[in-house]
Each structure stands twice: as C-alpha cells, then as structure tokens.
Amino acid sequence: MADKLIIFDTTLRDGEQSPGASMTKDEKLRIARQLERLRVDVIEAGFAASSNGDFEAVRAIADVIKESTVCSLARANDRDIARAAEALKSAARSRIHTFIATSELHMEKKLRMTREQVLEQARLSIRFARNLCEDIEFSPEDGYRSDPDFLCRVIEAVINEGATTINVPDTVGYGIPELYGNFIRTLRERVPNSDKAVWSVHCHNDLGMAVANSLAGVKIGGARQIECTINGLGERAGNCSLEEVVMAVRTRRDHFGLEVGIDTTQIVPASRLVSQTTGFIVQPNKAVVGANAFAHASGIHQDGVLKARDTYEIMRAEDVGWSANKIVLGKLSGRNAFKQRLQELGIELESETDVNAAFARFKDLADRKSDIFDEDIIALVGDESVTHEQETYRLLSLEQQSATGERPHAKVAFAVGETEFHAESEGNGPVDASLKAIESKLKSGAEMLLYSVNAITSGSTESQGEVTVRLQHGGRVVNGVGADPDIVVASAKAYLSALNKLHSKNERVAAQG
C-alpha cells in the first residue's frame, strides 16, 4: 500500500499574510468548511495569539470542523502556546504549530539570541506544548538557510521533547529543487531520532519553485507532509500551490508512489471561493484552476482532443471540479432549484434565513440578467447582505450621468450604521464620481492601492463585473470585492466593502514560516 502524503493547508494563516488578503471570521469559516469538503488533512486556521479577532476565528473553526485537524500557529513562548491551546479547546482534532528562527541572520538580527538560547527556548516550548496538546509541530523559521549542524541539534532536541511533526521551511524561497530535496534528506539521515516524527516541507515561491521544491522535499528528502495554500496565496510571490502539488502527486503516482486523501472535485470550488473572498484573481493560465487550464485554441490540439482527450490532456477537467454545465438558472427558477445548485457547488449556508437572503439576491440578479452562471452564484453568496458580515457602511442607491464631452456626475445614497447619507460629485468617469461622492461624506483618509475589474463570466456583455478595491490606512491593507451587472454599482460596493474591513479588522502580529 502506498504511503499517505499529508496535505497541510495554510490559506487561512500564511495565505492571509498577502497584503489585502485579510479575512473576517465569517469568511474564514466559509473557507474552512470548503477545505474540509476538500478533505484537507490539516487546516492551519490562524495565529491565535496575534489578535482577539484571530483567536475568535480559530476558536470558531475549531467548533465546526470535525474531520480535518485544526491547527494554530504560535511563537515559541508559553503565552502564545497557551493562547493557541485555548482557541483549539473544542476541536475534534487539534494541533499546535510552534516556531522559532534558527538561521544566523534571524537569530542575530531579529531575535538577538545566541544559538544556545534558541535551542533552549525551542526545547522548553515543545515541553510546555505537549502538556496541552498531543499533536505538536515544530518549524525552525528560515530553516533552509540555517547551519545544518545546529539545525540537527535543534530538531533532535524538540523530537526528544515530543514534537510529532518537523517542518523545514524555505522561508524566503531561496531553494533549488535538487538542493532543497537533498537538504531534507541530509537532515533526516543525521538526526538520530528522525523516525519519531513526520517530516514536512513549507516552500515560498520567490524564485517560482515552491511547488518543485516541495515535491523534491517529498521525493528526494522523504518528507510526508506538504504545507500549501489554495491558489498559491501568500505574501510576496506566494506559497506552494495546493492544487498543483495534489494533482502532480495524483497524476504522477507512478513517480511519487504516494496517495493523497483529497477530493479533487472540490479543488475548483475552493479556488473560486478563495479568489472571490480575497479579491485575488486567478490568472487564466494558472495550472489546474486557471480559466484556460483545459482550453485548446490550436486547431491541431482541438482535433486531437475531439478524437481522444488524452492526446493533449493529462487530467480531466471534471476531476478537479470544472463543470461542463455552465448555464444553470434563470428568472423562472425556484428556490428549490437554487438551493440544489448551491449544494452541487459545495456552498453551505448556515441557515434557512441565509438561503432566503441569497435567493432574494438571485431573483434580483435574474431580473437584470437572463442567464445565471455558477460564477454568478458564487459571487452573490459572498455578498455581505447574505453573509451577515458586520456592515458599518452599506450602499442604498446610486445614480450617475455621463455623456460625450460632459463631465460625469454621480449621486449616491449609503448608510453608516442606521444613519442615511446622500452625496453627489463629479469625476473623471462615473466610477471616479461615485467614489468621490462617498468620500465627500466619509473622509476616510484611506489610500487606494488597487482598482481592478474582472468579468465574472465571459462571452456576453450581460456578465456581472467583479470589482476589487485595495485600500491602505493606518498601516493596514485590505481588499474589498463587489459584484453587479453595473460596474459602477460594483465599484461602490467594493469600496464600501473595503471600508467595512478597515473599520472592523483588528491589528495583527505578522508571522512568517
């Protein structure tokens, strides 16, 4: 029987460290439920000690997830570890993941600690954690750039104290596949008690090799856990992509000889949910989950695929969750048909009240758009009016006028709590005029870093526009997403969505692994 490869998803922790990718508790819950449907082995739900908001998110996820192990990150100190254990108290399966840097650069410049101090702190942190939880993971931060002799001492010590998983991060994405794989193998060969723990890899994508390095760590190094994120989400150039490593191991089972427990038909729904929630659009040519991943434009390729799919396809689109049934509903569709399609898409709303709210949004959209696609449904169930996210700012109505040769003008009505405001402004275009009207009353002081428009579905001018707005204020960066057939309305929704996140998100302590 083939060995099992453990899939450790850190979308909700390391992925969230992407500038603008911060998520609310309810958003994290929705993604965690999808990760469980995906049958991820371990869900790193957050960094419980970083903020009250993250603590509550980890605790809420621990309350509802029953099959996957729920994990919280913690620095190698008693306070962080105790906070993680408290947040995970209700979990059916829990793990504490603690870390401390071991490279000379990090120890000297960041920690200002000697080797012996780091070794002792690592040892004591694992000893303390084992009193609170049986499943303990240890990561030597910047492990790949650490001195191998010292790293072996640290790893041997923490395994002796009870660490059950040893994760060796390439924190800055410096590794090359052959070198990184051999590095993991050398550590496993030199650490006397290496067989007492599962070995894991965590690779960043700064040189574009996170997936290749992770697979080398498994094939050459003998690791049996990969840490990864949906869509490769993560700070800087991102993390190892879950969908890519899973499909690589599954498609090339002849080479890796490993099994993964992932339900691959849930990969595309997970990708869409993370993209819609964070506002990070998936590039069309992204492997496995990009819109063009199974598209064939060349006539020769098209002819070959029509005759035999395996001429140019090594995977089947439906195996990763792409549906051939695109047009699903219309304005005559009833509530039961809508609810059934939600289930088919893997969308789980918390109550019948939420289903009713989503159906009301669907009927409103169907009155304005003849064909409703899966992507439209995914966008509308993420709307704050459906999810009951805390809405300090809420769009009520928008009217805009523009004509050739005239300066566009917009009138906007919106609510701040229970107070209604009316504002109007001119601008360089209808979107600019609308957002200036909102700012004329709010005076938020936020700086816009990004404005982008993406067609939710292609091939028709009826398509909804999905707008992402990235704002920065007080050192925090957030994304807001809005969808509507009218891109001016979508823009106002996205802007207010971002302001809601700025208003509600707690300060965080950054963690890197």
Swiss-Prot record:
Positions that bind Mn(2+): D14, H202, H204, N239
Essential cofactor(s): Mn(2+)
Gene assigned in the entry: leuA
UniProt pathway annotation: Amino-acid biosynthesis; L-leucine biosynthesis; L-leucine from 3-methyl-2-oxobutanoate: step 1/4
Species this chain originates from: Methylibium petroleiphilum (strain ATCC BAA-1232 / LMG 22953 / PM1)
Record's keyword terms, sorted: Amino-acid biosynthesis, Branched-chain amino acid biosynthesis, Cytoplasm, Leucine biosynthesis, Manganese, Metal-binding, Transferase
Protein name listed in UniProt: 2-isopropylmalate synthase
Enzyme Commission code: 2.3.3.13
HAMAP family recorded: LeuA_type1
Catalytic activity line of the entry: 3-methyl-2-oxobutanoate + acetyl-CoA + H2O = (2S)-2-isopropylmalate + CoA + H(+)
A Gene Ontology BP annotation from the UniProt entry: L-leucine biosynthetic process
Localization: Cytoplasm
